[in-house]
From Swiss-Prot:
[4Fe-4S] cluster 1 binds at residues 12, 48, 87. Catalyzes the methylthiolation of N6-(dimethylallyl)adenosine (i(6)A), leading to the formation of 2-methylthio-N6-(dimethylallyl)adenosine (ms(2)i(6)A) at position 37 in tRNAs that read codons beginning with uridine. It comes from Rickettsia bellii (strain RML369-C). InterPro entries: Elp3/MiaA/NifB-like_rSAM (IPR006638), Methylthiotransferase (IPR005839), Methylthiotransferase_CS (IPR020612), Methylthiotransferase_N (IPR013848), Methylthiotransferase_N_sf (IPR038135), MiaB_methiolase (IPR006463), rSAM (IPR007197), rSAM_horseshoe (IPR023404). It catalyses: N(6)-dimethylallyladenosine(37) in tRNA + (sulfur carrier)-SH + AH2 + 2 S-adenosyl-L-methionine = 2-methylsulfanyl-N(6)-dimethylallyladenosine(37) in tRNA + (sulfur carrier)-H + 5'-deoxyadenosine + L-methionine + A + S-adenosyl-L-homocysteine + 2 H(+). The gene is miaB. [4Fe-4S] cluster 2 binds at residues 162, 166, 169. Belongs to the methylthiotransferase family. MiaB subfamily. It comes from the Bacteria. NCBIfam families: miaB-methiolase (TIGR01574), MiaB/RimO family radical SAM methylthiotransferase (TIGR00089). This is tRNA-2-methylthio-N(6)-dimethylallyladenosine synthase. Its cofactor is [4Fe-4S] cluster. It is an enzyme of class 2 (transferase).
Length: 446
């Protein structure tokens, strides 16, 4: 009889990728995935620590799991093994056992390949096991090949960690220094994914455009080199990458956007603020004019490229003038979509120790203003697509039985009617008929 594995994933696409790999790791040991937490023998929370709210979600979920465990005991059933993985695990370590002593295993994002051994120890009645080692090479060397197809659009982690040390960010402390996978390893995984039916691959990294992986003969590949290598794979039709840092946007990578048709005309390029003073305080290593120059060069390389970004409002010391500079940058760049957040002090980061924290109500006011502007830009872009035809990759079911959902080259969700679902996994020409803030509707173009 197989054992059941339940994984709940928080945060970024890298965590989604890691969760798939945890699933692949445990399958040979008899653990099959389930979406029903109540039948799980092992429960893994793959956590995010980028903001305080994200971290607290972990403890809230652990509280719910504790109630589930208590109910199982009353019924005479065995308790599930509880694992906290990911960036909260890396950041808080033993504190997790202090706050939630019923957790069995705490494992960081660079050491989860040891999960089979850790779980077997818990089965043998060992308790409070922790593994937070930063051994990136061992992690990638010991991860299994893909067992469960991810679908028409799949992720591959090619780079982890960050050396930039932005003063608001925990990534260097939770994911470690920048590390790039070797080229052959990435290529083999991409080949396997495409052979299982994927049409699109998203290359992942905390700072993916800093990629500097080696080949077997010690030649160093940049991200542009890696893309040129991967697009040769037969039946791979689309390639994307995220997340990028402006200072690592090389001339070669920028020009590749205009030369390689498989590289999609959409780029997530976080700037965080439009104020030079705030950018310096954040240790972003560039100013607003540098960012504008990157955007101009990208648009010269490919006129139809669409940008998205991340913004943080209320970083310590941010004034009304600084916030006005952010709004000015947003209005000048004109984004297709964006993510925006209130600054959240993270323990251990320089920003958290500053005495000029912005009051919460001011952060909220600024976020409301910024999100209104960003939403207007996103809606305007979506509405500009009405009447056009786009190639859409349909990769998932919709809410209704006769509906499927796909992605445009610009990462917009598109809904169409397809009762027999025969278009899933295919790229189809669609005429856009309606637009909303977060999605498009269309019909098959004939």
């Amino acid at each position: 009889m197989s054992k059941k594995l339940y994984i709940k994933t928080y945060g970024c696409q890298m965590n989604v990728y890691d969760s798939v790999k945890m699933q692949d790791l445990l399958y040979p040991y008899g653990y099959e995935p389930t979406e029903n937490i109540e039948e799980a023998d092992v429960i893994i929370l793959n956590t995010c620590h980028i903001r305080e709210k994200a971290a607290e979600k972990t403890y809230s979920e652990l509280g719910r799991i504790k109630k589930l465990q208590d109910a199982r005991k009353k019924q005479g059933l065995n308790s599930a093994i509880i694992v906290v993985a990911g960036c909260v695990a890396q950041a808080e370590g033993e504190e997790i056992f202090t706050r939630t002593p019923y957790v069995d295993i705490v494992v960081g994002p660079q050491s989860y390949y040891n999960l089979p051994e850790l779980i077997s120890k818990v089965v043998r009645h060992e308790k409070h096991l922790i593994d937070l080692d930063f051994v990136e090479e061992a992690k990638f060397d010991q991860l299994p090949e893909q067992l469960y197809p991810q679908g028409a659009s799949s992720f591959i982690s090619v780079q982890e960690g960050c050396d930039k040390f932005c003063t608001f960010c925990v990534v260097p402390y939770t994911r470690g220094a920048e590390f790039s996978r070797n080229v052959e390893q990435v290529y083999r995984e991409a080949l396997k994914i495409v052979s299982s039916g994927a049409k699109e691959i998203m290359l992942l990294g905390q700072n993916v455009n800093a990629y500097h992986g080696k080949t077997s003969d010690d030649k160093v590949f940049t991200l542009a080199d890696l893309i040129r290598h991967l697009v040769k794979i037969p039946n791979l039709e689309r390639l994307r990458y995220t997340t990028s840092h402006p200072i690592d946007m090389t001339d070669d990578l920028i020009s590749l956007h205009g030369l390689e048709p498989k590289l999609m005309p959409f780029l997530h390029l976080p700037v965080q603020s439009g104020s030079n003073k705030t950018l310096k305080a954040m240790n972003r290593k560039h100013d607003r004019d540098y960012y504008f120059d990157i955007i101009d060069r990208l648009r010269k390389a490919r006129a139809d490229i669409v940008l998205s970004s991340d913004f943080i409002v209320g970083f310590p010391g941010e004034t009304d003038e600084d916030f006005a500079d952010t709004l000015d940058l947003v209005r000048k760049v004109k984004y297709g979509q964006c993510y925006s957040f209130k600054y959240s002090p993270r323990p251990g980061t320089p920003g958290a120790t500053r005495t000029d924290q912005v009051p919460e109500h001011i952060k909220s006011e600024r976020l409301t203003i910024l999100q209104k502007e960003l939403a207007a830009q996103q809606l305007a872009f979506n509405e500009s697509c009405i009447g056009s035809t786009m190639k859409v990759l349909f990769d998932r079911d919709g809410k209704f039985d006769d509906q499927i959902i796909g992605k445009t080259p610009y990462m917009q969700s598109v809904y169409i009617k397809n009762p027999n679902k025969d278009l899933l996994g295919k790229i189809i020409e669609v005429k856009i008929t309606k637009a909303a803030l977060n999605s498009l509707s269309g019909e098959i173009y004939r």
